[in-house]
Every structure is written in C-alpha cells, then in structure tokens.
A protein has these predicted regions:
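Active-site rim helix/loop that mediates acceptor-substrate recognition in acyltransferases
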Residues: 30-64
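Conserved acetyl-CoA-binding loop-helix of GNAT-fold acetyltransferases
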Residues: 110-115, 121-138
Length: 194
C-alpha cells in the first residue's frame, strides 16, 4: 500500500472534514483553545463550533497537520503546531510541574493522531509523524514535544491513543523528560533547521 501525504490547508480542508467527521467531532480543537468551551461533547453545537473554529484557524495559518491518503482518500492525520497554536498543553497539571524548556526559541507540539479504523496497524501514524517532523525542520526546527500515553489501560483502547505511543516517538529520536500524571509522559527532541 503506497500512501501519500499533504499538509492541512484551505485546499485540503475538505479532506480533513471527511476524516474528522468520522473521528467524533473534536476536530483537534481541544489543544488549540486556552480554556475549555462550555458545551458538552454530546451537544451538536459543540461539533459545529469545533468545525467552524478549525476552519478559521486553518484560514489564518494557525493550524497545522499532516494528512495521509490512500490514493485520494484521506485515512489519517497528525496534528502539530507551535506552542502558541496549541496553548492548552500549558494548562495541564503535570505539564505545569515541568514547564517548557528554558530558552527554547521555537517550541513545537505534536498533540493528536487519528487513523481510520480500516487503516490501523499499517504505518499511517508513523508516516504522519515522520512527515510532521520533516515539516517542522523545513519551518526552522526547534524543540518538539510529544505527550504519548503510557497507561496500559488507556493504551489498550484505540480511541485513547490519539497522543501516540512512547515507542513510536522513541524510534524518531525523542527522549523521555518527565511523567505527566499517571497516564502520559513528556518526550522531547531537538530538530536542527534545514
């Protein structure tokens, strides 16, 4: 199976919509907001607001993701972005104990993966991660953070692996920095610019 990749943009937003609708309605907006919105995830307005806000972020160039395709069908994505694009991480209790690295000029974050059920276990997330890291390098590099799940209970459920796994990040050269509560771990890697 030969996959291709594309960056999330106004041109690829309709492809993102196709796969985001399958994912459940978050639209990868949780970490793009500094504070939670006051709607429950079961509320139809929550999904509409997330879609609208994601589109606006993409149009402003404030939302980054790698889309993975099987021919012309979008089958997965990896969201990444600069710290200012994904501010919610800073509010996490575990993250606040560690904080961002001192003196980091450019801090990037990898927050979400989604792979269509029919394509899981076929290397889609790995391809998306590699492409995201290459994109970060082209954009000047810097320190990249990841927050994979380490809880065996949570990792056993596909829907809870949206952060990725420690193993996939370790293979890309990330090192463990600190635990994030009992369910996650902070990992970092420095990428030199092109």
């Amino acid at each position: 199976m030969a996959f291709t990749i594309r960056e999330l943009s106004t041109r690829t937003f309709s492809d993102f919509e196709k796969i985001a609708a399958k994912q459940g309605g978050c639209w990868c907006m949780y970490y793009q907001r500094e504070k939670p919105i006051r709607l429950k995830s079961s509320d139809p307005d929550w999904k509409k607001m997330n879609r609208k806000d994601k589109r606006a972020s993409v149009e402003k160039g404030k939302s980054h993701a790698i889309l993975v395709y099987d021919n012309e069908t979008p089958v997965g994505w990896c969201q990444y972005g600069a710290r200012e694009e994904l501010p919610r991480i800073d509010a996490g209790r575990g993250y606040r104990k560690v904080g961002p690295p001192a003196g980091a000029e450019k801090l990037w974050r990898i927050t979400c993966f989604f792979v269509d059920r029919d394509y899981r276990g076929k290397g889609v997330a790995k391809l998306a991660l590699t492409a995201a890291l290459e994109s970060i390098k082209r954009q000047g590099g810097g320190i990249v953070e990841a927050y994979p799940v380490v809880s065996k209970k949570m990792a056993a459920v596909a829907e809870w692996r949206w952060f990725g796994t420690p193993g996939m990040f370790k293979k890309e050269g990330f090192t463990k920095v600190a635990p994030l509560g009992t369910s996650g771990v902070l990992m970092r890697k420095t990428i030199s610019p092109n």
